[in-house]
């Protein structure tokens, strides 16, 4: 995937602290995004030492333009300045999910059934952490992916990153 952004809702960089930080950011920012008329596709918070990156993915019918990202960035920055949920330096990035869109929720996985995906787990499952194959759908709290002729049920809570693999057929 090269330099393409690949993300999942829960980062384990600092364990539970990052997860609860991410949940706090989601609760704070999703209403802002939705209030501007966009879908909050997902939020990623990555702590990298003294500097962090906060990424907000937005979507809407017909696609996202740079002006859309700018509008969300302005509003999100204002809320973040007032609420101050991140104590360290950070960079705010707002973008569309893109063609290789990250998948964050069971609903997103279900709606992209039939597409090729790349999934990375936090810890190995059946001896592996990386899965690339056909997204079959979801079953309860598991994502079903077919790799070669073998079907894997991957618990959504164990997924670190998941992305659609764009098809150019």
From Swiss-Prot:
<keyword id="KW-0963">Cytoplasm</keyword>
<dbReference type="GO" id="GO:0005829">
    <property type="term" value="C:cytosol"/>
</dbReference>
<dbReference type="Pfam" id="PF02576">
    <property type="entry name" value="RimP_N"/>
</dbReference>
<dbReference type="Pfam" id="PF17384">
    <property type="entry name" value="DUF150_C"/>
</dbReference>
<comment type="similarity">
    <text>Belongs to the RimP family.</text>
</comment>
<dbReference type="InterPro" id="IPR036847">
    <property type="entry name" value="RimP_C_sf"/>
</dbReference>
<keyword id="KW-0690">Ribosome biogenesis</keyword>
<dbReference type="InterPro" id="IPR028998">
    <property type="entry name" value="RimP_C"/>
</dbReference>
<dbReference type="GO" id="GO:0006412">
    <property type="term" value="P:translation"/>
</dbReference>
<dbReference type="GO" id="GO:0000028">
    <property type="term" value="P:ribosomal small subunit assembly"/>
</dbReference>
<dbReference type="InterPro" id="IPR003728">
    <property type="entry name" value="Ribosome_maturation_RimP"/>
</dbReference>
<dbReference type="InterPro" id="IPR028989">
    <property type="entry name" value="RimP_N"/>
</dbReference>
<comment type="function">
    <text>Required for maturation of 30S ribosomal subunits.</text>
</comment>
<dbReference type="InterPro" id="IPR035956">
    <property type="entry name" value="RimP_N_sf"/>
</dbReference>
<protein>
    <recommendedName>
        <fullName>Ribosome maturation factor RimP</fullName>
    </recommendedName>
</protein>
């Amino acid at each position: 995937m090269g330099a393409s952004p690949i993300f999942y809702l829960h980062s384990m960089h600092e364990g539970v602290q990052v997860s609860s930080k991410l949940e706090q950011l989601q609760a704070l920012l999703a209403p802002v995004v939705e209030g501007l008329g966009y879908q909050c596709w997902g939020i990623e918070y990555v702590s990298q030492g003294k500097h962090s990156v906060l990424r907000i993915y937005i979507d809407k019918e017909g696609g996202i333009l740079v002006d859309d990202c700018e509008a969300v960035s302005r509003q999100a920055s204002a809320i973040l300045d007032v609420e101050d949920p991140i104590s360290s330096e950070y960079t705010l990035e707002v973008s569309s999910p893109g063609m290789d869109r990250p998948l964050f929720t069971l609903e997103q996985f279900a709606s992209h059934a039939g597409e090729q995906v790349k999934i990375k787990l936090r810890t190995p499952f059946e001896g592996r952490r990386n899965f690339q194959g056909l997204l079959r759908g979801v079953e309860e709290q598991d994502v079903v992916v077919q790799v070669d002729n073998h079907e894997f049920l991957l618990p959504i809570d164990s997924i670190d990153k998941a992305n659609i693999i764009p098809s150019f057929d």
